[in-house]
């Protein structure tokens, strides 16, 4: 135990002593590193690495020596007998090692001082060399400048010498010419002297000339000296100007260099600003495109919501006022006046006009005129229905409406002698719940067709100027030329689900043989703008020149289902169930209480699309116009033909129901004159894809079954942008109650007609 602890202490002491040497060398290295110049970094790094390796080698040698001595001490301890001798020897060894280490320390300190002196000498030498290099560099630059100046001076002197040489050559040439002239003059004078006589006068003249010549020569000599002086002055000015020119050229070069740098900097700034402007313009275009899309989508959704609210409110008010005959106020964009009780028959007309006004007008297209004719047909049929309801059964007489080819309708009462009625007993004078059922079925078709119709015109944006095709899943599509096809495509779909107790359209219900059907003609209706201008001769005018004209019984679809309003249908004779749109839920009302069908004991009010106009005594008093007789021959012959044609067309429409929309009956002013009966006419039309099977069955008995159709409309507006596609969906559910009736007995119909008459 003692031996083991002793060995541990010895090893620890030796290890700490071995570590003292590198630790003592660290401050010296740091001092050297701080004192060294920056350009000695590489040399110092190399020296530090070499010193580190040397110190590590020395430490390893010392550790090896310590371990060797410890091993020898342990071996000697094993040989000794007592611990005192071992301790004494060990202490002696430690003292000897301490003396050796002290000597080694003094030696290392001496070597460190010598190395420090050598380093100081080397640093001083290096600094001296650096100073010498700087001096030599400055001297070299100065000598280069002097050499450049000497070269420039030499060049200037050479140029000046060249100019002077040219001037000297020119002066020599000029002097040679003058000398030749003088010699020529002298020779001429000599010849003259030789040839002329030696007279005193001539001699005196020659002397005078000689004097003059000498004077002229002296003057020329003075001029020559003056010219030389001027040449010297000009040369001095030329040297000055050359020096100024050189200075200016140098200044120009310096300015060019400076301005080139500035221009480059400005060009870089301009490029940077141009890139930023382009990026800002792109972001602005994206933002403006998104804003336009959002505005279009917002306006479309707001228009749809307002349209549905207006449809629900106006149709609920109109239908309720149509039965109780009270004035109402229409909250529409185009009709805001309050109607009087006399004009109660115009409610359904105004409803159809509001629905038509909600659609975008396709001006300039060939489909516009048939759509207007269709709306006029609906309006006039509704006017006839409401006028018949207001007059009541006691004011009615057998009468027919004869539509001439010129567009004028004449109402002629039936003459018993000249024109007997079409059916004996006049069963058309006996309205019952079937007429009301027919009217409500017409409203139901209008509602479904309006739901399938196109949207209201969206606010035009600058970006969209091309035509847009709004596809309606089903029978057709509407064309709206106001928008672009790739901007905000609007899609609509209609899903129709029928109840369990619905009567299939191919059941045994047949139309009554006593209701003639006008011929089917497309595009023959008068335009909607001229509806109030048509008059009937002999008929009671309603309001100011607005005749109640009856139109076709079926609805024509152009490129898609026509529009309709009237989500809210009020029932008489039973309490309403639910307040959603004033419509009943699935499950059905009890028999005899559906869609405003009145009981048999109540006074009948006739509502149909093919009602005859009849003239009563009250209207005769008000209008003050005498009745006119019926054309009997035309009426009797055309009743049978139209019944046959109608039944054939009904069969064709049943077969083609799944392929396209039903045609519209719109007799115009050029159509043949046809008599109209008071009972409704059943037309099975529409497409099965849209669920628009609206077959109004005629029956005098209460309805046996009630059919419910649930029309679910989903309209989606897709917004296309550069990053993503966002879809907005709006869903409206309309539950519509339709009354199906079975075939009644002809005998029972005749009895009821005679009793009602």
Curated annotation (Swiss-Prot):
Site features described as Interaction with MIP, chain residue numbers: 456
Sites bearing Phosphothreonine, chain numbering: 628, 674
Region of interest called Coil 2, as start-end residue ranges on this chain: 201-319
PTM info: Proteolytically cleaved during lens cell fiber differentiation with increased fragmentation as fiber cell age increases.
Tissue: Abundantly expressed in both the inner and outer cortex of the retina, expressed at a lower level in the nucleus of the retina (at protein level). Detected in eye lens fiber cells (at protein level).
Domain IF rod: 39-319
Annotated lipid attachment (N-myristoyl glycine): 433
Positions of modified residues (Phosphoserine): 5, 340, 419, 512, 701, 754-755
Residues with site note (Cleavage (by CASP2, CASP3, and CASP7)): 432-433
Site description Cleavage, residues in chain: 40-41
Source organism, top-level taxon: Eukaryota
Protein name from the UniProt record: Filensin
Organism per entry: Bos taurus (Bovine)
Lineage of the species this protein comes from: Eukaryota, Metazoa, Chordata, Craniata, Vertebrata
Designated gene of the protein: BFSP1
